[in-house]
Design a protein with these regions (language model features):
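Conserved interdomain linker/interface between the two RecA-like ATPase lobes of SF2 helicase motors
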Residues: 172, 186-284, 332
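Conserved pre-motif I regulatory segment
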Residues: 2-50
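C-terminal helical accessory/scaffold domains
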Residues: 494-496, 502-503, 507, 513-517, ...
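Conserved segment of the helicase C-terminal RecA-like domain
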Residues: 374, 381-383, 389-430
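Conserved helix/coil segment N-terminal to the catalytic DExD/H
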Residues: 111-148, 344-348
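SF2 helicase catalytic motif II
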Residues: 131-134, 140-179, 183
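Conserved C-terminal RecA-like helicase domain
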Residues: 80, 96-107, 275-352, 357, ...
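Conserved SF1/SF2 helicase motif Ia
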Residues: 67-90, 177-178
Length: 836
């Protein structure tokens, strides 16, 4: 492809956008796959772009957005969907650079902050996660007004059982509501990309081009054998490198790989299967690297010591201490157990080449743009569902694709560590699977019961689908409907409709007089055969059904064994969501979670009325931890042993529990989750929680955040439950009060006496306890402090004059705001008041 075809000046883009790309981002020519995709995008067509990591997919999407907003549909809006919050922040930064130059407002939607709401309402381009967009379409359907283009990044995560169904429903709903909107999907290479493009009516652009050539190799013990090269037109490397043997211990191939790449000025990413492995590997590599730097680059140790000291000062756990120690040797680990501040420090240090190596779990490959010259996938198996399984090819390719930094590295090196058996034979098998083998097809995960009941209720409650025919039509527009037989799809829908009706989340408002059969694919001889004893029909499906979530019964619990045991819903059936169903959909929780919460809360009310067993904050936290929406902490093998501290805790709180569960691994995980939350709101130090339960600060924060959200959901569900008599409503109110108190304590991590103080900006639970020990109980007490007490407070460690003045100013602002609100309330006429 010649240069004129790749020149920005030939795209017809606004002059100021071309100027921005050339002057700010240094882009004058498009990469070949970008140039191949841009004509389709510029013309406004739906486009699916499947090219390797770091090949410039995002720029194509940005061009499409600017073209729609400033050329094709002036005054319209764009939505950029990402699967992860970390990726949202990255895209937000890039789009804000564009927006500042072109006078376009960029908004972010990843949580519930009030500032986000204002951004969402006012922005021209909204960057959001799939879950946030789904929630917005339920609560604020006007978010789609004026939208002319939608970008779905990391589209291959449609294959993910957790995130995939929401992405699939979002795309189906957007196509249903906005059939004329342009859809741009960005994906890694997948096996059935053409079928996916057909589903979305998109032009498919596939390329293997990379900005930096990528050499794939297997590493068996210390023997490195290059297997394939994915070339770039910019590369001077034409052939595979020769096999060679690395220097170093056979027992530590990661060190051999690191010392080898570091000697040539490169960095290393090591992917391992678990958090524990990431920390252990980083610790070993850091110790070796620290000795190496002491001999060869002692100046580097000074810079690393500064970073280590910074991490140590902010550390509140053994894991944080370990991270700070690893960093002394230029190595760090990266996983979901880290706090956000720790991840940010580590990522920036690696980007700035202060760190030479990161050990990480596979989540890094999907979420953060941190390329390195060399990638080593140390672990190709993962422990899953009680057994060790090989990783999918797609996932490994994502990791390997992080090798090679554009503009910095002459080539990327993607290495696969081969373990066990005959090294040569294992290496050949690994190469055949992960280097030369095909990538798996993407399959819809929407048929799984959690996904189907969640999105089916949403479609009825907030999606405007009120009859069986329209429901079927909508779900036929999903990838599940595109790739599966009609009868399989309709049976999944109908079984879940029956469950939602049974649980009173929806009701039938106009039951059809005559059931219509969906079994139009069943031959006539089946009717006669099925009446014979012992004869049933097995339906062949194009993909394997998704297993029920471990630890839960299937919500439908239908026990379907043959054709006669299932009754389909009539096509003319009408449905509407109940008050409970509407609220559950708005709360964005699984209907099964709502059902579990409702059952437990009803038991709690009966206990309060009868004054039998206790209902405590622990009771409520344990109930929440039993729902599928809560990510339970899993007990370690030692914690499952009889006589363990966790077993003892389970026995002590048995009378407080609101749900019945067997004493198994999952049940102990629920107790552990509630106990972790209890330790948090009883003001235990994060180090103490880590010592007691082995839970890192990042996990404490993520679980307590989830707990707070689900306690709010429990409150709303209880308020909409209509089974109790009027004489018992006072007891319901008592339980609502306990839910509110528990949620406030969980969110603040403190005892009840500090709840007023932690409302003050800049006052967390530790500072609130310091104030309490000085006799300060309320924000008003702060305003009454004498100069002597103020000076005493300013002198305390971690406080200081500036902080104290800010806190006092914050309290004053709260007091003024409350006075203004009181006056406004006093001026508001009462209902029925005459206004002459």
């Amino acid at each position: 492809m010649g240069e004129p075809d790749r020149a920005l000046s030939n795209l017809g883009l606004p002059e100021n956008f071309q100027t921005f790309l050339q002057q700010e981002w240094g882009i004058k020519l498009l990469h070949p796959p970008q140039a191949k995709a841009v004509p389709s995008v510029i013309s406004g067509k739906n486009t699916m772009l499947c090219i390797p990591t770091a090949s410039g997919k995002s720029l194509v999407a940005y061009i499409g957005i600017v073209n729609q907003l400033l050329n094709l549909n002036k005054g319209s809006r764009a939505i950029y969907i990402v699967p992860l919050k970390a990726l949202a922040s990255e895209k937000l930064g890039e789009l804000r650079q564009i927006g500042d130059y072109l006078n376009l407002k960029i908004g972010l939607g990843i949580g519930d902050a009030p500032s986000e709401t204002r951004q969402i309402d006012d922005c021209d381009i909204l960057v959001c996660t799939s879950e946030k967009l789904d929630s917005l379409m339920r609560s604020k359907p006007e978010v789609l007004s004026r939208v002319s283009v939608v970008v779905a990044d990391e589209f291959h995560l449609l294959n993910d059982s957790q995130r995939g169904p929401t992405m699939e429903i979002n795309l189906a709903r957007i196509r249903h509501i906005l059939p004329d909107a342009q859809l741009i999907t960005l994906s890694a290479t997948v096996g059935n990309s053409q079928d996916l493009a057909d589903w979305l009516n998109s032009e498919l652009i596939i390329s293997k081009w990379r900005p930096v050539s990528l050499e794939y190799a297997t590493l068996a013990e210390l023997d490195l054998e290059p297997r394939a090269i994915q070339k770039s037109e910019l590369s001077t490397t034409e052939n595979l490198g020769p096999p060679r043997t690395l220097e170093g211990p056979k027992s530590h191939v990661a060190w051999a790989a690191l010392s080898d790449v570091y000697s040539n000025g490169g960095q290393l990413l090591v992917f391992v299967s678990s958090r524990r492995s990431a920390q252990a590997e980083a610790k070993k590599l850091g110790q070796r690297m620290q000795k190496h730097l002491a001999k060869n680059n002692p100046e580097m140790l000074d810079s690393l010591k500064e970073l280590s000291n910074k991490l140590s000062r902010n550390s509140n756990s053994v894991m944080g201490d370990t991270l700070a120690e690893c960093v002394k040797g230029g190595v760090a680990f990266h996983h979901a157990g880290l706090m956000h501040s720790q991840r940010t420090e580590i990522e920036n240090a690696f980007k700035n080449r202060l760190l030479c190596c990161l050990t990480a779990t596979p989540t890094l490959a999907a979420g953060v743009n941190l390329p390195a010259r060399r990638v080593l996938v140390r672990d190709l198996k993962r422990y899953d569902d009680g057994m060790s399984r090989l990783l999918p090819v797609m996932e490994v390719r994502q990791m390997l694709g992080r090798a090679g930094r554009p503009r910095y590295d002459p080539i990327g090196e993607a290495w696969l560590a081969c373990k066990g058996g005959d090294p040569r034979q294992v290496a050949d098998e690994i190469a055949d699977r992960y280097i030369h083998g095909p990538v798996e097809d993407i399959t819809s995960k929407l048929a799984a019961e959690p996904a189907m009941r969640f999105h089916l209720l949403s479609s009825i409650a907030t999606g405007g689908l009120t009859n069986r025919r329209s429901i079927g039509d909508f779900f036929r527009g999903t990838y599940l409907g595109h790739s599966q037989t009609n009868s399989y799809l309709q049976e999944n829908i109908d079984s879940m409709l029956k469950w939602l009706v049974e649980k009173r989340f929806i009701r039938r408002t106009n039951v059809g007089e005559q059931e219509e059969s969906w079994n139009d694919e069943i031959p006539s001889w089946v009717s006669a055969a099925q009446s014979a004893s012992g004869v049933s029909m097995v339906k062949k499906k194009s993909t394997e059904p998704v297993e029920a979530t471990f630890g839960f019964k299937k919500a439908s619990s239908m026990g379907v064994t043959g054709l006669n045991s299932f009754e389909y819903e009539a096509l003319d059936n009408e449905y509407e969501a109940t008050s409970m169903g509407h609220r559950v959909s708005q709360l964005y929780i699984d209907p099964l979670s709502a059902d579990i919460l409702l059952e437990g809360l009803r038991r709690a009310v009966r206990r309060i009325v009868r004054k039998t067993l206790p209902v405590t904050s622990f009771s409520l936290c344990h109930l929440v931890s039993s729902t599928p929406d809560f990510i339970s902490l899993w007990p370690k093998s030692k914690e499952l042993e009889f006589g363990s501290r966790l077993r003892q805790k389970g026995a002590l709180v048995e009378d407080e529990l609101l749900i019945e569960s067997p004493i198994d691994e999952r049940a102990m995980g629920m107790v552990k989750s509630a106990w972790c939350t209890e330790l948090w709101y009883e003001e235990k130090d994060l180090r103490d929680i880590e010592k007691e339960l082995g839970v890192t600060p990042g996990d404490v924060y993520s679980r307590t955040d989830l707990m707070g959200w689900l306690l709010l959901a429990a409150r709303e569900i209880l308020l909409r439950d209509d089974i109790f008599a009027d004489e018992h409503l006072g007891y319901v109110s008592e339980l609502v009060g306990l839910l509110d108190l528990t949620r406030s304590r969980v969110r603040a991590g403190c005892k009840e006496d500090l709840l007023q103080l932690v409302q003050v900006r800049g006052v967390g639970r530790n500072r609130a306890r310091t104030l309490s020990e000085m006799g300060i109980r309320t924000p008003a007490d702060l305003l009454a402090l004498s100069n002597f007490d103020l000076d005493k407070l300013k002198s305390k460690r971690g406080w200081g004059p500036i902080l104290v003045e800010r806190i006092i100013d914050s309290v004053r602002n709260i007091a003024v705001g409350q006075q203004d609100k009181t006056r406004r309330d006093d001026d508001e006429p009462l209902p029925g008041e005459r206004q002459d």
